[in-house]
Amino acid sequence: MFKSGFITIVGRPNVGKSTLTNLLMGEKLSIVSNKPQTTRNNIQTILTGDDYQMIFVDTPGIHKPKHKLGEYMVNSATDSIKDVDLVLFLSNPCEEVGRGDKFIVEQLKNQKAPVIFVLNKVDESSPEKVAKTLELFSKEYDFAEMIPISAMKAKNTDKLLELMVKYLPEGPKYYPDDMITDVQERFVVAEIVREKALKNLSQEVPHGIAVDVIQMKQDDNGKYNIEVDLICEKASHKGIIIGKNGQTLKKIGSTARYELERFLRAKVNIKIWVKVRKEWRDNTSLLKELGYKKLK
């Protein structure tokens, strides 16, 4: 019997959704950073086994929006819960169930798919706190299963995969065996550059940046020539991104090039231009140009 279905991964910002997706896939497709709200789009990845096919939707963290980009991220995450076959609800060990988690629980009550509660980052907590957290969440919702894991350390993730297969419905193979994502290469390129910017910039700047791939061409020798605009909201941020003698921008470019060459399996030449677009996160037309389509 072949099983298949769509699986959405939800949770507050920075609970490890992208890390878990990347671990299960064995490919770096979702942007990973220690800063919250790094995933902005629902990234669809495909995992095919001998008797199953899982289509993962890695969502932005659900949080109280402060601008139109935030509204897009929250709408995108809550919409992904609808019409799926299985939901993974990720959280971390805690002393009490917070407002963000309670909000997600309320969204879950409006759908019929089974929900597996996944308690991530248990390697960073005591067994007592892990047990207490599982007990707290068991009182909030009738979960199909509850499982503690560490996505970073790959602890108990094999058991999680078994549970996911268990709750998938019988179904067809939606995608070819060798297809691992439905997103375009240009999108992944932009996400890689944005990840490197996040890791090399201060707390004030990162979430005010976006990446627009202006050009992506492969020459006769197979080398990619890529040009991107790194968009920020303030002139002062532009100076921070470039850095003294251009050192910060050079570091973003060199680390991005290394990751891009691994992803594209080819040599890469990348040029990054820093541009100021004031209050772009509240500019609906510009947001749509940058790929955030679900704005009302």
From Swiss-Prot:
One of its GO terms (cellular component) is plasma membrane. Monomer. GO terms for molecular function: GTP binding; GTPase activity; ribosomal small subunit binding; small ribosomal subunit rRNA binding. Residues 3-170 form the Era-type G domain. Residues 58-61 are annotated as: G3. Residues 37-41 are annotated as: G2. Residues 149-151 are annotated as: G5. It comes from Clostridium perfringens (strain 13 / Type A). This is GTPase Era. Residues 201-278 form the KH type-2 domain. An essential GTPase that binds both GDP and GTP, with rapid nucleotide exchange. Plays a role in 16S rRNA processing and 30S ribosomal subunit biogenesis and possibly also in cell cycle regulation and energy metabolism.
